Amino acid sequence: MWTNTCCSHPLGIPGETGSNLPDSVDGVKRAAQRKLDHELGIKKEQVPFEDFRFLTRIHYKAPSNGKWGEHESQYTLHDRSLVISTNKHDAVDYILFIKANVNLDINLNEVRDTKYVTQDELKALFKDPTLKFTPWFKLICESMLFEWWSHLDSGLEKYTDEQEIRRM
């Protein structure tokens, strides 16, 4: 099943938690750096803290096959063509973008496979009935990611630092 490739899992330790939005965003960024290294072997020097851009927070619910569904949180980080996600924090997803050239050293206990794709390639993959995607990844992509991705090089500022939580 294809999905985002990194889950940050912020820990209840100094530096990865916060009592207000700016501190929480900073904590998510630090956790993302830690887990990018753990899961994908991306060293934090390749994904500098200050290069992460906070866009918004979301709270989502994704029904599945009628028997199972999902109602939890994912933080999602996106590079130009590498999609990375982080996980649960205060039951709200934090959406961060980072554009970086990275070297991968995959932790096979965490990640089965990776694929760099363009926006058009990802849209084509979604149409392939033989491929399966996690519900949260597809929901975020179809409702917001493609719009943001189109503005990654110019105009992304209008999407950054949202104060409201989007309900999905």
Segments (PLM) and residue ranges:
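Alpha-helix capping at helix-to-loop junctions
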Residues: 37-45, 60, 101
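Nudix hydrolase/Nudix homology domain
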Residues: 2, 6-7, 13, 53-168
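A short coil-to-beta-strand element that immediately follows conserved catalytic motifs
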Residues: 43-55
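Generic detector of short, locally flexible boundary/turn motifs and exposed helical patches
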Residues: 19-21, 40-43, 78-82, 88
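Conserved Nudix-box catalytic region and its N-terminal flanking loop in Nudix hydrolases
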Residues: 1-42
